Structures are given as C-alpha cells and as structure tokens.
A protein has these predicted regions:
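Conserved active-site and cofactor/substrate-binding residues in soluble primary-metabolism enzymes
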Residues: 3, 31-39, 64-71, 83, ...
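Generic secondary-structure signature for well-ordered alpha-helical cores
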Residues: 6-17, 42-45, 49, 74, ...
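Pocket-edge structural micro-motifs
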Residues: 34-35, 41, 60-61, 124-126, ...
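Internal helical hairpin/lid segments
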Residues: 48-103, 107
Length: 165
C-alpha cells in the first residue's frame, strides 16, 4: 500500500528487484506495459491489442502451470510481440500445484526454453502479481531499465519521458 500511495503522490520514481545472473550491464528505455498474461493473450489479434514496439513488457499470472505459461508466452513470441520489445519482465506465476502430468517441468525450465528461442532479454523476479509485497508500476510511462550485476532498477523520472498514444 505504501508503494501505491507514493506512486500516486508522485514521490515514487523507481522500483528495484533482483534477477538471475547474466544480465549485468543491460540498459534501455521504453514504454512500460503489460499485466496478466492470460488477459493479454485474449486480446491478441483484436482491435484492443496495445501495439507497442520498443517497450518493456511485464507479465504475471496465477494458477497456471508452467506449460500453460510457456504456451501463452510462445503465442506472443510467434506473433512478433516479444521480439518487438526491449525486455520482458516476469512477475509472479504462483498458485499452481504440481501434478504428475507436469513431469518435472518447472517455471525455471520454461524460462530457459523461452530464452533459447526469444532474442529479447527475459528477466525474472519482478515483485508483481498475486504476492503479498508488490511494486506499483507506472503503466504507459517511459521507464529506464538498468541492471547492475543482479540488481534491476526501473525508473520513470527519466529524460526519455514523453506521451504515447
């Protein structure tokens, strides 16, 4: 709640989180957009799809098995959505229960598979979704993404801020 109040009052200008190793030095800016992965996929191909290129896409979902998350992210990949972004930030994908049908297929495995086919950096660890402690994100604003070792900083008090239709 504090993060939301700070964001609404204009006091919050950045959020940070930790991701895996391998993205040190990543830097870019773009329009921050996204939300629930299932909802986004349901909009694909409709007039309501947000056509954003060069953005920073964030997604989350709940109660979806890794193979289903993979299917939805591959749908966005095959539609050219992921390749058109500067980066993809994965929030929380909890709430699902292991099943014998999963055969050990985990979210970590799914992320590795996606990274193998997608040319865009895919970062995990964004504290967003159905989690007790989450960040408030300025959807639709230009943000700057910086990674130093495993620390990710998303800031929106940047010089690149401008209106987007």
């Amino acid at each position: 709640l504090d993060c939301f109040i700070e964001a609404m009052s204009g006091e919050l200008e950045a959020v940070g989180f930790r991701t895996e190793a391998g993205f040190d030095g990543l830097h870019g800016h773009g329009v921050l957009w996204g939300g629930n992965l299932t909802v986004l996929c349901s909009l694909l191909g409709t007039p309501h799809w947000p056509r954003i290129e060069g953005g920073i896409l964030f997604v989350e979902d709940i109660n979806e098995h890794p193979y289903r998350v993979e299917r939805m992210l591959l749908q966005l990949h095959q539609a050219g959505v992921l390749a058109a972004q500067k980066a993809v930030l994965l929030g929380d994908f909890g709430g699902w229960r292991k099943s014998p049908l999963d055969r050990g297929y985990t979210l970590k495995t799914m992320v590795a598979q996606l990274r193998a086919v997608c040319p865009v950096p895919i970062l995990t660890g964004l504290p967003f979704g159905h989690v007790p402690t989450k960040v408030t994100l300025p959807v639709g604003r230009c943000v700057e993404l910086q990674v130093l070792r495993r620390d990710v900083l998303l800031s929106w008090a940047c010089d690149h801020d401008h209106d987007h239709d």
